Regions:
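Surface-exposed cap/loop segments at beta↔alpha junctions
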Residues: 1-46, 57-58, 73, 101, ...
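Intrinsically disordered, low-complexity terminal/linker regions enriched in Pro/Ser/Gly
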Residues: 30-44, 48-51, 129-175, 346-383
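Oligomerization/assembly interface segments of phage tail-like spikes and tubes
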Residues: 1-10, 265-277, 314-320, 332-342
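Solvent-exposed coil/turn segments that connect beta secondary-structure elements
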Residues: 7-11, 93, 100-103, 278-280, ...
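Acidic, low-complexity/disordered segments
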Residues: 209-240, 285, 290-383
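Extended serine/threonine-enriched, polar tracts that run as long, contiguous segments within proteins
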Residues: 68, 76-77, 94, 102, ...
Length: 383
């Protein structure tokens, strides 16, 4: 048999075309121009965009169209939300150019409703006898909609890596900018914990964004009297922030793009969930779903209900969908790659202060030559 791989016509145009052009004004207009022009991507597909407040002039030098759009996305600042950096992706409905926060909220005032609700549950008799006719097997016909909500398999493929999160600047980072025009050096610190409530997250409830449901609890690290968000030296970045390059056009402020975007992208790489579910073609990348994950512990008392995981249940954002169609088995399933950037229930804040036992610390240091001399002395005395 043959294995055939497909791609869009835009991918072919991207392979042999390049963009060498300067764009000024709103960035979404530049994206639409690259998408439509025949000498670039020559696309006729629908484009859904989120308006930007970025009014700048950007020069794209001999760059492939999709790479040019990725660059423009990195420079975009939302008109309604505080986050920085846009996503450019395609679904069955066309292309999308928008921020992550616009996927999680509606008009900047409320969390976006879930498109579908999944639950990990025991398969029904109808599911286990799906190849049998209901009239012959003596079972009731399937409740199709209820079966669609069931999860065939799930796994978390990216467990939280605290050291990577710290070193890459998720929780805190420091950026030093140098402006050659004004001859000015400025330092900016980013604090994930203190700025958490400024943005919509997967677990934001209502219009109130103040509830802290971050990836780490609010607690000082050991005896430093600082939490993870105050350790800005964990990630140091240096950038040129020159002004007056294109007359009255100004670049997006780096303090509003680089640091925030770095943290947000790292948040998307932490709680990553893979779901195998029944096929449902109304779901697309960028939709919000809910997943009820049972708490993995035994039910002791009769009549008690299975509790949901307080941290990993809840709302997820779909990052990618893979449809799998088995023609011979008459079966359609989907693999959903999802993420969440907040826990359902806030981690318990640390209330017991750390008190190091200084008496047990061994602060002395010893020369290896002294150890060798003691070893030789002991051996000669015992000889």
């Amino acid at each position: 048999y043959y294995k055939i791989f497909f791609c869009s016509s835009e991918m072919y145009y991207n392979s042999f075309n390049r963009v060498s052009q300067a764009y000024s004004g709103p960035i979404e207009h530049a994206v639409d121009d690259i998408l439509r022009k025949k000498e670039y991507l020559n696309s006729t597909k629908f484009l859904t965009y989120e308006p930007t407040k970025t009014n700048t002039k950007l020069v794209i030098p001999n760059t492939k169209p999709l790479n040019a759009i990725s660059f423009l996305a990195s420079q975009s600042i939302s008109q309604r939300y505080k986050n920085a950096g846009y996503l450019f992706y395609e679904t069955a409905n066309g292309f999308n150019f928008r921020s992550v926060e616009s996927l999680l909220a509606v008009n900047g005032v409320a969390p976006r409703p879930t498109k579908f609700d999944y639950k990990y549950q025991i398969q029904t008799v109808a599911q286990n006898n799906e190849n049998k006719s209901p009239s012959l097997s003596g079972i009731k016909p399937k409740d199709v909609f209820q079966d669609l909500k069931g999860v065939l398999r799930y796994e978390f493929d990216r467990p939280v890596n605290m050291l990577k999160n710290i070193n890459e600047g998720l929780f805190a980072n420091k950026m030093i900018t140098h402006d050659s025009f004004y001859k000015k050096v400025t330092t900016h610190d980013f604090d994930y914990l203190s700025s958490f409530g400024d943005y919509f997250h997967t677990e934001t409830q209502g219009a109130d964004k103040a509830d802290f449901k971050g990836l780490v609890p609010l607690h000082d690290y050991e005896d430093t009297q600082k939490d993870f968000g105050e350790q800005a030296n964990a990630k140091l970045m240096v950038y040129c922030d020159n002004q007056k390059i294109h007359n009255n056009f100004e670049f997006p402020p780096l303090k509003d793009t680089i640091q925030n975007r770095r943290s947000q992208r790292l948040q998307m790489m932490n709680i990553n969930l893979n779901l195998e579910v029944y096929g449902y073609t109304l779901l697309h990348a960028g939709d919000v779903i809910s997943f009820d994950l049972p708490l993995m512990r035994p039910i002791i008392n009769e009549g008690d209900k299975q509790q949901s995981s307080p941290y990993f249940s809840g709302r997820y954002l779909i990052m990618a969908i893979k449809h799998e169609i088995d023609v011979n088995g008459n079966k359609h399933t989907m693999s959903l790659k999802c993420m969440k950037d907040a826990v359902k229930t806030e981690y318990t804040p640390g209330v017991i202060p750390f008190k190091p036992d200084t008496k047990s610390y061994n602060k002395a240091f010893t020369s290896v030559y002294s150890d060798d001399l003691n070893y030789l002395t002991d051996n000669f005395e015992n000889a």
